[in-house]
Amino acid sequence: MSDLVIPSEVQRLAAQAVRHTTPCGAGDLVWHVWGQARPGVRPLVLLHGGSGSWTHWVRNLDALVAAGHQLWVPDLPGFGDSAAPLSGGDADAMVAPLREGLQMLLGNAPCDLVGFSFGGMTAGLLLAAHPELAERLVLVGPRPWAWCPTGSSS
């Protein structure tokens, strides 16, 4: 496959997904689900980077489903097909609608959580406030300098 993601690939994956919605702001938080739930295997939740949507994960979805994961991939609040949160568009504003959505969709069962870039910061904030939501956290392409005090270079 070339480095470019072709629209037909996105269309194929979108058609295979099961779509769920949970409340967010004045509308919905949209969740895309691939794969089947399996006993003893936690759902894998993928949070995309900023200015994106579930399509940030296009190249990973087939392999993760083939490996036996059930994937829950939201369009973060204010991105993709999801409504903006009422409290703004920064990572802090993502925590409440994501927590509510995860509890509505997965109940009290913990997931494994993967966050890419802005989604990594969001995942960290989510689990700092609600550590019971996930057993594992994976950060992909995090920005460690974002947490350095002003004027610090490392």
Label each region the model flagged.
Residues 56-58, 82-88, 149-151:
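Conserved catalytic-core motifs of eukaryotic protein kinase domains, centered on the activation segment
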Residues 30-81:
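Conserved HGGG/HGGXW glycine-rich cap/lid loop of the alpha/beta-hydrolase fold
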Residues 43, 70, 110-112, 133-136:
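Structural signature of beta-strand start/N-cap positions in the alpha/beta core
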Residues 115, 119, 123:
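Gly/Ala-rich beta-loop-alpha elbow adjacent to hydrolase catalytic centers
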Residues 13-14, 18, 22-26, 32-34, ...:
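Active-site loop/oxyanion-hole signature of alpha/beta-hydrolase fold enzymes
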Residues 82, 117, 141:
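Catalytic nucleophile serine of serine hydrolases
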Residues 124, 128, 134-154:
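Flexible "cap/lid" loop of the alpha/beta hydrolase fold
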